[in-house]
Swiss-Prot record:
A GO term from the CC aspect: plasma membrane
Subunit structure: Homopentamer.
Origin species: Flavobacterium johnsoniae (strain ATCC 17061 / DSM 2064 / JCM 8514 / BCRC 14874 / CCUG 350202 / NBRC 14942 / NCIMB 11054 / UW101)
Name under which the protein is recorded: Large-conductance mechanosensitive channel
Statement: the UniProt record of this protein carries the keyword Lipid metabolism: no
InterPro entries reported in the protein's UniProt record: Mechanosensitive_channel_CS, MS_channel, MSC/AndL, MscL_channel
Main location: membrane
Amino acid sequence: MGFFSEFKEFAMKGNVVDLAVGVIIGAAFGKIVSSFIEDVITPLLLKPALDAANLSTIEQLTAFGGVKYGLFLSAVINFIIVAFVLFLIIKAMNHAKKKDVAPPPPPAGPTQEELLTQIRDLLKNK
């Protein structure tokens, strides 16, 4: 077996392909979730804090060395959403793989003629 054929066999194994798909989907979906969190969720969460501090923008809230808890919340929410969606994708892929694999056929037992032959031989020996 040559080097390239061994590499091809390794690369085409299910685990390597699944890992590659997971990384690509995770990166692409991560950007979507980041945009959703930063552009939609974070402003909604920080709006009450801005109103309480009589400020108009998020930048004013952190201009004087304030804690950027909004960025931390954004990262946490981002991680939770990406992890949950990847869990659902992997669960669906595993479910699909289980359907594709046919159960092995039951072991072939002796035929009726073989059983009758065995019974006849046992009766002869008595």
